[in-house]
Amino acid sequence: MLHLAGQDSRTLARRAGISLEDARRITGAVIGRGAPLRDARNVRRSVLDEVDALATPGELRLLESVDAKDGFRKYLFELPDGLRVETVRIPLYDTHHVVCLSSQAGCALGCAFCATAKLGLDRSLRSWEMVSQLLAVRADSERPITGVVFMGQGEPFLNYDEVLAAAYALCDPAGARIDARRISISTAGVVPMIRRYTAEGHKFRLCISLNAAMPWKRRALMPVEQGFPLDELVEAIREHAALRGRVTLEYVMISGVNVGEEDAAALGRLLAGIPVRLNPIAVNDASGRYRPPDEDEWNAFRDALARELPGTPVVRRYSGGQDEHAACGMLASRRRGD
């Protein structure tokens, strides 16, 4: 896949100095159909030559794909420099798919419950490497792909410009044609970039990984709390909600750690008056250090949330793909059996 696959048609037109119409035709070929540049229709050869001269050859190599029992499919890709990343295809309603993309090879944030954190950070992905994950999964899918979540390996807001470039390439009507409202970008709470994202007015859904409402507890789970404290994060959430609408807060539930009555009460105090959606999800920890709550613990936590955050949507996310380590928090860039 060429470097230009990571650009939307307007960016391509500006950088290549070509007409927007030609850029749309090229985007339609490379991203819309997953075809080579030379297969762009109704574009003069001289224009293709100009664009080709700007493109950097490179491709993602599919090393392996494995199917979980519940229909999730995990892909292991090798990047041009030999690094590996994983991508997950998520089935929805037996009619379409959502794709979970990685934005970095590894991650530097060190969240205690996440397998990717144990890898450390090798590098950030380029926009075309993220778009190419989607194109490879699409080529392997009979059902349409109608949504994208930047929730795979890495911290998207520590690769801000490339992630936004990929998101705009994916929602380009000339390319992948994914509704921008169905593209979600998740962050562990990089406050300056949240504020920049809010100020710039992007149309994608913002998701923030919260996981605890007490600073000391969040710091133990997420070292990012040391650099971007909870009070600053909540102010950034409040600002975004006021200007751009409801924020989705992800909450990894860990038995005996963050699902007690006191945790629900702390969430109620922290989020009072802020329009948010809370998405709890059970922890997935292959190491066995952390356990998900059982049904009684979840039910008690849910009821406590209803009391402490009346009117706040609380939607429990399904934790799929566990048997093949395709679930949230389990991506470790390994082949099956490694």
From Swiss-Prot:
Keyword Disulfide bond: yes
One of the record's GO molecular function terms: metal ion binding
EC class: transferase
Annotated positions binding S-adenosyl-L-methionine: 154-155, 186, 209-211
Keywords: 4Fe-4S, Cytoplasm, Disulfide bond, Iron, Iron-sulfur, Metal-binding, Methyltransferase, S-adenosyl-L-methionine, Transferase
Disulfide bonding pattern of the chain: 100-328
Cofactor(s) annotated in UniProt: [4Fe-4S] cluster
Domain of life: Bacteria
The record's free-text note on cofactor binding: Binds 1 [4Fe-4S] cluster. The cluster is coordinated with 3 cysteines and an exchangeable S-adenosyl-L-methionine.
Major subcellular site: cytoplasm
Binding site for [4Fe-4S] cluster: 107, 111, 114
Segments forming domain Radical SAM core: 93-322
Family, as annotated: Belongs to the radical SAM superfamily. RlmN family.
Protein name (record): Probable RNA methyltransferase Adeh_4229
Organism this protein belongs to: Anaeromyxobacter dehalogenans (strain 2CP-C)
